[in-house]
Every structure is written in structure tokens, then in C-alpha cells.
Amino acid sequence: MATFSGCYTALITPMDRNRQVDYEGLQQLVDFQIKNGVNGLLAVGTTGESPTLDWNEHTKVIEKVHEYSSNRCLTIAGTGSNSTQEAIDGTQHAHDFGVNCVLLVDPYYNGPSSLEIRKEYVEPIALQFPEVQIIPYIIPGRTGTQLYPQDLAVLHKQYPNVRCVKEATGDLKNMELTRQVCGEDFDILSGDDDKTYTMIISPDIAASGVISVVSNVAPRAVVDMVHYCLDGNEEAASVISQALQPLFNIVTVKTQEQTPYGPVACKARNPLAFKTLMNVLGMPSGPCRQPLGKMTRSGLDVVLINTRKIYESNPQILKPVSDYFGVDLKDRL
């Protein structure tokens, strides 16, 4: 079975002005990512707006990402659901098209226990598709539930195709326990860009890479940071990680907005800020589908201020965008 190592981009799904999938733009984004050295592409994760794509669109985007990549990198299909049968159907379709790796987010809203996630969700899929790599995706802040390390370890011991996790708990102790109970032959991928450096260099976590949002606009920098970490060059990796901090800051953008009845906290969550930034930079992106809307004026200011910091202090980070898409970033920012 494959070892998961490096940078895997959680690809956005570009839309046209009518909020229909822009497949020409998607092909450009796939090529841009591969030419900048990513190890793989996650199609239709949360960043790819899986909640608002119907399953016909969902499976077509997965097919197209796999087709466009032409086996130049790994395709990971986001086939998770809060319905096991739906996840099985999605995994079957991905497998039929030649995709042999899927990401299974913990079932959201209906909130099964960790035991149920193991026995009634991941296990049936791992059993039915032994030749497909299964990556559980642990993100309790979005799902309201969590597959715990102990149940993950049971899955890993019983099923050789469960040998990796996307870890987005934000809890370093949970990550350390995952390493402890799952062993050295289990791969941990960061699901939070701002924690990737720490997760890889920590000997008690020993992550091997990241499924990244930030690499949508800065693939080469994230690729290099991860490779330096894995090669033991922590100083070089730290320099890049610090340089990327302004982009880490905008994965989620928090502002306070005024209403006639007083101020309201506003949290623009991924992928809204990054799709907004990609529009600004001249990359294929388009709008998000409702109920995600538009950045507020103050939210857009946060995106622009942080991106200008990157452009002014470390212009090489965004240079692949200008080189590939032929845009003048100075004019756009």
C-alpha cells in the first residue's frame, strides 16, 4: 500500500458566474498544481464545496480531476457523507473510474459515536473496497463528532487499506495519541495549514505531510516547506512557514459586522476567503454556491492586507501564479 507523504492540495471547485462548475478552469488549476510539484489533489473535499454539489456533479468533478491529472499525481476523492450508503456509492463510482484513494469525513450532524463511526461507517467501506486507500478525516469543529485514536488504531490493525488520517482536530495531544496507538507504519497528514510545520517536526506526532488549502495559491511554497521538514532542514522549513503566515491567517476570516440591532460576529469559513483571493489574483475560481455568499467589505480587506504582506515581503511565494496565469499581481493587489 502507498505511503502518504508531501503536499496534497484540497482543490477548490471553480464556478462560472451562474455558479455552474467551470471545467476548463478546473483543468487549468489541476495543471498549475502538478507543474508546481504537489504530490496529489483532493477532489470535492470541503474546500471543493462538497456540501453544495449534487452527486452527479460530485462524481463528475472527481472524474475530471483524475482525467486531467493523467496519473501525474495521486487523486484523492472526497466521498464521505453522513450516510454510509451514500459514501459507499460515491466510493464505488470513484473506484470504477480508476481512483483508488478516498477521503471519508466523519459523519456530520447526525453525530454517531466514535465506535459507530468505526463499525458502521469506515469499516464497511474498508471491507467492501480492500484495494482502495481509505483516509478518515477528523474535523470535529465542522462535524460535531470524532473518530478517536483508539478506534482509528483498531481500523488500522484490521484493514491494511486504512493507514492514513487527515488530522484537523487542532489538538496536539490527540495527534500524539494517534501516533502512539497507531504505530510508526501509520501516516498522519495535517488538515490545518498553520499546524503543518509543528506536526511534522514533532517526534511525538511525526506527520508526513498536509492536505492543504493554502497550496491552492502557493503550491510551490507549501511543497518546499513540507519537503524541508521531512528532510530535517527545520530552519529552512521554518522560514517558509513564517513567510506563509499571512495566508494561514485567511483560511478563516473573522470580522464584526454591523446590523440595525447591533454588531454581529462574522466568520467567513473556507473556501470563501481563498476563492475570493483567487478571483483577485486572476485564477479560475468564481463564486461560492449558496449558502456561502460574498466576503464583507471588512473581510475582503483582511484578505487583501494579508496577501499584500506576502507580495511585498516574499513575492516569490505568489510568483507561480503570475508565471502560469500570465497576470500582473502588482496591478491586481
Residue ranges of model-derived segments:
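Active-site beta->alpha loop and helix N-cap motifs at the rims of alpha/beta catalytic domains
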Residues: 2-146, 154, 291-293, 317-333
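A general structural signal for well-ordered alpha-helical segments in protein cores
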Residues: 26, 62, 87, 122, ...
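Active-site glycine- and acidic-residue-rich loops that bind
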Residues: 116, 169-170, 264
